[in-house]
């Protein structure tokens, strides 16, 4: 990462007005606060809410490592005087940092399969396995918050959009604004996709999955999708992301005010 990322370019982009701000979120293991470390334009002030706070700083690779440090799988990372872990932990408002940094549009890359959440539940013939239970617990931590926050944002947009500036000020909502969103979600379940790459796991891990019945149980790939870092699976994820984005190419170009592709 140190070889690939040039953090000095963040400073340059902010100085030139090309970048409003950049934030990286991690969870403080000492107090459980979701902490957003950021670099931004001078008018962006630090914020603090219940169990959420921000810290202006010079971003480094350490902030990235802390933000992606899955508990029990990767060690916590020390930033200043505290240790931090995965940014999705305790992040009840994942869209908030970008909005507070000045975003008026949010391009959201989801990891939860798109589709109707209210479709008929598949019939379960066996009790859930340990990895299946663990997978649902991880989904509750890493997936549910962004979907819930997006629904909240859509309700706020519906409230704010009909009002003009004077009406917003009279209602005490002068700082509120409509935030446009575009979500790109996987067209396939990552849990089921992960099951196709079980053979890439170390033998000891495959043995554990076999003994717990996880390989043959529908929906048991949830936990596996969080711990599978093998090349084949990662490459397939990138390919799926590209395919799903190209499937919405016109929506993406419209969202970013880009000219349509020529025929």
Which residue stretches match the model-derived regions?
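Patatin-like phospholipase
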Residues: 1-263
């Amino acid at each position: 990462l140190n070889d690939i990322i040039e953090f000095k370019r963040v400073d340059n982009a902010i100085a030139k007005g090309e970048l409003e701000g950049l934030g990286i979120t991690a969870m403080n293991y000492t107090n459980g606060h979701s902490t957003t470390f950021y670099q931004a334009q001078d008018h962006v002030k630090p914020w603090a809410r219940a169990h959420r706070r921000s810290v202006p700083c010079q971003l480094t690779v350490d902030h990235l490592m802390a933000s992606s440090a899955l508990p029990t799988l990767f060690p916590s990372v020390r930033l200043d005087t505290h240790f931090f872990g995965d940014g999705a932990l305790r992040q009840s408002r994942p869209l908030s940092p970008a909005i507070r940094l000045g975003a008026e549009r949010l391009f959201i890359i989801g990891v939860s399969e798109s589709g109707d959440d209210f479709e008929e539940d598949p019939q379960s013939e066996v009790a859930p396995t340990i990895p299946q239970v663990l997978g649902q617990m991880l989904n509750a931590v890493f997936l549910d918050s962004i979907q819930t926050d997006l629904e909240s944002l859509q309700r706020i947009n519906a409230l704010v959009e009909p009002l003009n500036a004077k009406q917003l000020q009279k209602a005490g909502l002068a700082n509120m604004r409509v935030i446009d969103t575009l979500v790109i979600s996987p067209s396939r379940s990552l849990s089921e996709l992960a099951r196709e790459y079980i053979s890439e796991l170390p033998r000891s891990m495959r043995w554990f999955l076999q003994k717990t019945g996880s390989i043959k149980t529908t929906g048991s790939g949830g936990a596996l999708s969080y711990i599978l870092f093998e090349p084949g699976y990662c490459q397939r994820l990138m390919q799926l992301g590209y395919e799903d984005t190209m499937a919405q190419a016109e929506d993406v170009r419209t969202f970013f005010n880009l000219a349509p592709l020529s025929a």
